């Protein structure tokens, strides 16, 4: 099993670019930069896309330009066009249930209230069995404050921790293709930015 599509979840537009909810897109942007494969808008996939080679494998990158709760439209369009199965997809997203400075790989599971994941599961035929990269953004402590929190911009001190976790996650994702998922997971899950 290899990953053929890496997706970074986000809301479109300048007003959302620096918000916590866009952490998944920050990850794919960094990966595209590291692999010198600039993302370009591609209307038929409802997002910015690029094609990279990782460990000799042909991999597509995608940042949907739909709103977060319609992310599945872009993912399903690309998966269908390139005949990519759910278990060949890695979706990077912001994760309230992980602390700042931490990122973790996970296969399958629920959506945990994340509207992007919810729509992807639905558009993949109610199939939750895709890989996720959960990027810790911390939790505001009160569930009534969650919407404002994820759509807010982290202060510089928090942004630094998120960026460091994303940087390590990019290295570990590349490692996944060369050394396997177990090794990459062990390294990523041992990391915590200080």
Curated annotation (Swiss-Prot):
- From which domain of life does this come? Bacteria
Q: Which residues form the active site?
A: 21 (proton acceptor)
Q: What class of enzyme is it?
A: hydrolase
Keyword RNA-binding, does the record have it?
Answer: yes
Q: Where is this site: Stabilizes the basic form of H active site to accept a proton?
A: 94
Q: Does the keyword Hydrolase apply?
A: yes
Q: Name one GO biological process term.
A: protein quality control for misfolded or incompletely synthesized proteins
**Subcellular locations according to the entry:** Cytoplasm
**According to its record, what are the GO cellular component terms?**
cytoplasm
Q: Which UniProt keywords apply?
A: Cytoplasm, Hydrolase, RNA-binding, tRNA-binding
**Entry EC no(s):** 3.1.1.29
* Pfam families in UniProt: Pept_tRNA_hydro
Give a short account of what the protein does.
Hydrolyzes ribosome-free peptidyl-tRNAs (with 1 or more amino acids incorporated), which drop off the ribosome during protein synthesis, or as a result of ribosome stalling. Catalyzes the release of premature peptidyl moieties from peptidyl-tRNA molecules trapped in stalled 50S ribosomal subunits, and thus maintains levels of free tRNAs and 50S ribosomes.
What name goes with this protein?
Peptidyl-tRNA hydrolase
């Amino acid at each position: 099993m290899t990953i053929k599509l890496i997706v970074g979840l986000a809301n479109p537009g300048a007003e959302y670019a620096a918000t916590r909810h866009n952490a998944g897109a920050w990850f794919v942007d960094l990966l595209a930069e590291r692999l010198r494969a600039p993302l370009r808008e591609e209307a038929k996939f409802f997002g910015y896309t690029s094609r990279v080679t990782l460990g000799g494998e042909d991999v597509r990158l995608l940042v949907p330009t739909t709103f977060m709760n319609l992310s599945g439209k872009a993912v399903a369009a690309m998966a269908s066009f390139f005949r990519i199965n759910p278990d060949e997809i890695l979706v990077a997203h912001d994760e309230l249930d992980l602390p700042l400075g931490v990122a973790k790989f996970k296969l399958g599971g629920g959506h945990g209230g994340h509207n992007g994941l919810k729509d992807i599961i639905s558009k993949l035929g109610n199939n939750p069995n895709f890989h996720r990269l959960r990027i810790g953004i911390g939790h505001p402590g009160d569930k009534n404050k969650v919407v404002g929190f994820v759509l807010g911009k982290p202060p510089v001190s928090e942004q630094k921790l998120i960026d460091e976790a994303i940087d390590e996650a990019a290295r570990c994702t590349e490692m996944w293709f060369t050394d396997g998922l177990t090794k990459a997971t062990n390294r990523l899950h041992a990391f915590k930015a200080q």
